[in-house]
């Protein structure tokens, strides 16, 4: 398939800014913003609404933002250490955020082969 080139700004169309979005698969969610010396991959569905973790002009993560999504991410910040991110079921134990990642780490005090460990520990997206 021939890539389609659209001229637009990160999340909205403005005539004064000329960033390029390349749709390689024809799917609006599979795209990259191309700059002279850098490429920013935007979150899935970013074309539909402005993402609060990204600068709408530069399409880059905002300064001092930790994460984009995940069970231990809220408003682009890691949740504080000790916040429950996965409730216990049965005799199981809660999983807690560690304040350093957007993922929900497995409680280290759980048994090695926990029958309640489904689905797998939840993952999120960290901003780099």
UniProtKB/Swiss-Prot annotation:
The disintegrin ocellatusin-10c1 is a poor inhibitor of platelet aggregation. The disintegrin inhibits the adhesion of cells expressing the RGD-dependent integrin alpha-5/beta-1 (ITGA5/ITGB1) to immobilized fibronectin. Inhibition on alpha-2b/beta-3 (ITGA2B/ITGB3) is low, and there is no inhibition on alpha-1/beta-1 (ITGA1/ITGB1), alpha-2/beta-1 (ITGA2/ITGB1) and alpha-6/beta-1 (ITGA6/ITGB1). Disulfide bonds join 53-59, 67-76, 72-97, 73-102, 85-104. One of its GO terms (cellular component) is extracellular region. GO terms for molecular function: toxin activity. It is found in: Secreted. A motif (Cell attachment site) lies at residues 89-91. The keyword Disulfide bond applies. The keyword Cell membrane does not apply. Residues 26-112 form the Disintegrin domain. Belongs to the disintegrin family. Short disintegrin subfamily. Expressed by the venom gland. This is Disintegrin ocellatusin. Keywords: Cell adhesion impairing toxin, Disulfide bond, Hemostasis impairing toxin, Platelet aggregation inhibiting toxin, Secreted, Signal, Toxin. Monomer. Residues 1-20 form the signal peptide. It comes from Echis ocellatus (Ocellated saw-scaled viper). Residues 21-65, 116-128 form a propeptide. InterPro entries: Disintegrin_CS (IPR018358), Disintegrin_dom (IPR001762), Disintegrin_dom_sf (IPR036436).
């Amino acid at each position: 398939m021939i890539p389609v080139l659209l001229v637009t700004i990160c999340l909205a169309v403005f005539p004064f800014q000329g960033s390029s979005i390349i749709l390689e698969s024809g799917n609006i969610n599979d795209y990259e913003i191309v700059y002279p010396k850098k490429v920013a991959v935007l979150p899935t569905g970013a074309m539909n609404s402005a993402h609060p973790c990204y600068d709408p002009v530069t399409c880059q993560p905002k300064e001092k933002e930790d994460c984009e999504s995940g069970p231990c991410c809220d408003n682009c910040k890691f949740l504080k250490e000790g916040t429950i991110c996965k409730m216990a079921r049965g005799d199981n134990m809660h999983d807690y955020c560690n304040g350093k990642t957007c993922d929900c780490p497995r409680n280290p005090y759980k048994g090695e082969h926990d029958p309640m460990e489904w689905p797998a520990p939840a993952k999120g997206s960290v901003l780099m």
